[in-house]
């Protein structure tokens, strides 16, 4: 164990260091789910810009000409509040609050789509309020102010996005394979920067020498010298190489100390299987079934599935007709398949048929692949837009599935993956879903490596299940449908 020189009460320098290190956390945890404080701040600023845009558009247009018809400020302010909230939600839905979104035509298109969605909802909202006029002039001015305001805010945000203001500084304890996993996670889209990898005498170091730092005094002094916000413990062999006294000194000095699995959970929103130990699953908060949350999820499933079926009935009819036309009336419109659900129990899943009727005539289960020849032309469209999944709303109503959860797999795949991947069966602790956290964050899987990566996201969801996370996933699924991400 590494000995720390001069342990005991901190001197004045250490007291000053505590003030320097007392910075806001990079992530805020809401019902277990990590959200970047940067995007929370960005959303709050844009909310204010949108709120002011409608107020300005309304009063500039109507105050001088129709003073007798101008509604009280409180009423218009409340409606502007609703407009701003709807627009921010629409911006989340089209992916405008995600890391690494490039500036360009696609960015502007997303903003225009978000504004189109929000203006439609806001106009309907305005017409439910008596004595409030919302003409084309108000809509035009509000749109202009909103567009200029949001683009200006985003321009400033992107200008400073690469600065240290938006990143927290991480010191990694270790230079082996575990430390290398942090190095591999680094990238321009991440909200952290590694300021050094501390060499504590591990054999078989993987980190290049220029990035290594020696522990010459204490970890507290090194954290201060490197202006680090967080210490990540990533030593390969904790039993022999872990400087417990140093780490405890950092913790007791008010510095943030995090184990490697929790660091990945916070920064990548997944549970890293390569460094996961069973003890973390046991002692880490989460992985709890709460009756109130389960009841809330079931209520959301029933209401959401019923509304989606009612609204989507014309679409489902059109899809069914499209499948029938392409197959020239031969072959079934619906496709039924056994999948594994809650507790490992099998159930019968329904989909619109997107492949040839003889896709698995030999009886061998296969993953879909890129450009799979078994997929029909119309089937490719409904797979890309996820319209083939709509019949699963009936599975949701029957309680076999939820709107949100890990995607259900076939028994053949489950048996194989359970023998290859640790903790694979844990994804069956919750109901399978129509959409899920893995679907938002990873492409369609067609290999064991893909299944492993998706399992890491599924375990994050199982650990942090909440109504809030379900609503976030449902909202962000809109982008997946609009842009056809991950379909094969």
What do these predicted regions represent?
Residues 2, 153, 157-270:
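A solvent-exposed beta-alpha-beta segment
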Residues 376, 419-488:
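C-terminal terminal-structure detector
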Residues 2-165, 297, 488:
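Signature of alpha-helical transmembrane segments in polytopic membrane proteins
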Residues 22-24, 29, 102, 211, ...:
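Glycine-rich flexible loop motifs, especially short His-Gly-Gly/GGXG/HXGH segments used as catalytic or interaction
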Residues 111-115, 166-184, 331-355:
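Membrane-cytosol interface motif
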Residues 368-431, 473-481:
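A short, structured surface patch at a secondary-structure boundary
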Residues 292-358, 395, 472-488:
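A hydrophobic, helix-centered structural microdomain
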Residues 200-205, 264-265, 270-274, 333-374, ...:
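Short, glycine-rich, amphipathic interfacial segments at transmembrane boundaries or analogous
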């Amino acid at each position: 164990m590494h000995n720390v020189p001069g342990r005991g009460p901190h001197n004045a320098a250490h007291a000053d260091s505590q003030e320097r290190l007392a910075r806001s956390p990079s992530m805020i945890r809401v019902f277990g789910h990590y959200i970047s404080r940067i995007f929370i701040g960005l959303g709050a600023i844009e909310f204010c810009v949108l709120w002011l845009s409608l107020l300005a558009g309304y009063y500039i247009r109507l105050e001088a000409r129709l003073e007798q018809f101008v509604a009280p400020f409180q009423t218009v302010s409340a409606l502007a509040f609703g407009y701003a909230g709807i627009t921010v939600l629409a911006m989340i839905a089209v992916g405008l609050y995600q890391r690494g979104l490039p500036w360009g035509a696609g960015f502007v298109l997303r903003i225009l789509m978000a504004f189109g969605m929000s203006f439609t909802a806001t106009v309907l909202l305005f017409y439910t309020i008596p004595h409030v006029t919302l003409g084309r002039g108000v809509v035009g001015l509000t749109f202009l102010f909103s567009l200029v305001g949001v683009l200006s805010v985003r321009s400033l945000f992107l200008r400073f996005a690469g600065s240290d203001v938006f990143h927290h500084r991480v010191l990694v304890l270790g230079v082996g394979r575990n430390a290398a996993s942090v190095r591999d996670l680094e990238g321009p889209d991440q909200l952290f920067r590694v300021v050094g990898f501390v060499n504590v005498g591990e054999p078989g170091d993987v980190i290049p020498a220029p990035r290594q730092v020696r522990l010459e005094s204490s970890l507290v002094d090194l954290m201060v010298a490197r202006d680090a916000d967080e210490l990540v413990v990533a030593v390969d062999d904790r039993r022999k190489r872990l400087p417990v006294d140093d780490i405890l000194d950092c913790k007791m000095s008010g510095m943030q100390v995090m184990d490697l699995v929790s660091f990945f959970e916070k920064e990548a929103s997944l549970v890293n299987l390569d460094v996961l130990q069973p003890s973390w699953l046991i002692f880490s908060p989460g992985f709890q079934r709460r009756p109130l949350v389960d009841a809330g999820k079931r209520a959301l499933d029933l209401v959401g599935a019923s509304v989606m079926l009612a609204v989507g009935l014309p679409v489902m009819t059109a899809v069914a007709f499209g499948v029938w036309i392409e197959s020239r009336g031969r072959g079934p419109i619906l496709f039924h398949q056994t999948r594994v659900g809650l507790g490992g129990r099998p159930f019968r899943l329904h989909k619109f048929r997107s492949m040839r009727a003889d896709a698995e005539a030999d009886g061998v289960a296969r993953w879909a692949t890129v450009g799979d020849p078994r997929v029909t032309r119309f089937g490719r469209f409904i797979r890309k837009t996820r319209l083939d999944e709509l019949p699963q709303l009936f599975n949701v109503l029957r309680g076999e599935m939820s709107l949100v959860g890990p995607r259900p797999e076939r028994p053949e795949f489950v048996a194989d993956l359970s023998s290859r991947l640790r903790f694979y069966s844990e994804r069956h602790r919750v109901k399978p879903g129509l959409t899920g956290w893995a679907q938002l964050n990873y492409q369609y899987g067609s290999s064991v490596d893909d299944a492993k990566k998706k399992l890491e996201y599924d375990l994050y969801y199982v650990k942090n299940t909440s109504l809030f996370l379900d609503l976030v996933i449902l909202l962000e699924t809109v982008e997946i449908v609009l842009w056809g991400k991950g379909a094969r």
